[in-house]
Amino acid sequence: MVNSDIITVGIGDCAIARSPMKIKTSGLGSCLGITLYDRQKKIGGLLHTMLPNIKDAKLKDNPAKFTDAGIEYLVDEMIRRGGSIDKLEAKVVGGAGMFENSRLNIGERNIKSARETMKKLGVSIIAEDVGKNYGRTVIFDTLTGDLLIKTILKGDKLI
């Protein structure tokens, strides 16, 4: 969905925008919100992933659902639209453990997958707000590269 200056990204989706646009996603529990930003070109992308690895999936039709494949897809799209791989900065938010006693540990596995994939691609993660047990909404500012994290009970934070 596009508002005059904010693009909203749903679960298993991503968007890329140039300054001064903002990109927003909500409902980050065990899911991850991952931003990539090229500070020189003022281009940024936001990805909302659900699951850690595409290799474990029966349906592989949407790479943005998966942390590993989604990051690779977003990096490729950022480069295709003028970003430089050596200039990309990443921020990672979410990966909460929303349910006690969950043996699936989706949040933890998403965080691990993001870190491993970024390392493999040579992209630096410059900030994180991950884990814990609460949901988050993020608003990414492509003018500054700032990421506003909103929570219901924990307040707002800028990374």
From Swiss-Prot:
Alphabetical list of InterPro entries matching this protein:
CheD-like_sf (IPR038592), Chemorcpt_Glu_NH3ase_CheD (IPR005659), Cytotoxic_necrot_fac-like_cat (IPR011324)
Q: Recall the GO molecular function terms of this protein's record.
A: protein-glutamine glutaminase activity
Q: Name one Pfam family in it.
A: CheD
Class of enzymatic activity (EC top level): hydrolase
GO BP terms: namely: chemotaxis
The record's catalysed reaction(s) read: L-glutaminyl-[protein] + H2O = L-glutamyl-[protein] + NH4(+)
Enzyme Commission number(s):
3.5.1.44
Keyword entries, A-Z: Chemotaxis, Hydrolase
Top-rank taxon, per record = Archaea
What this chain does, per the entry, is described as: Probably deamidates glutamine residues to glutamate on methyl-accepting chemotaxis receptors (MCPs), playing an important role in chemotaxis.
Family statement drawn from the similarity comment of this UniProt entry: Belongs to the CheD family.
The name this protein carries in UniProt is: Probable chemoreceptor glutamine deamidase CheD 2
Q: Which organism is it from?
A: Methanosarcina mazei (strain ATCC BAA-159 / DSM 3647 / Goe1 / Go1 / JCM 11833 / OCM 88)
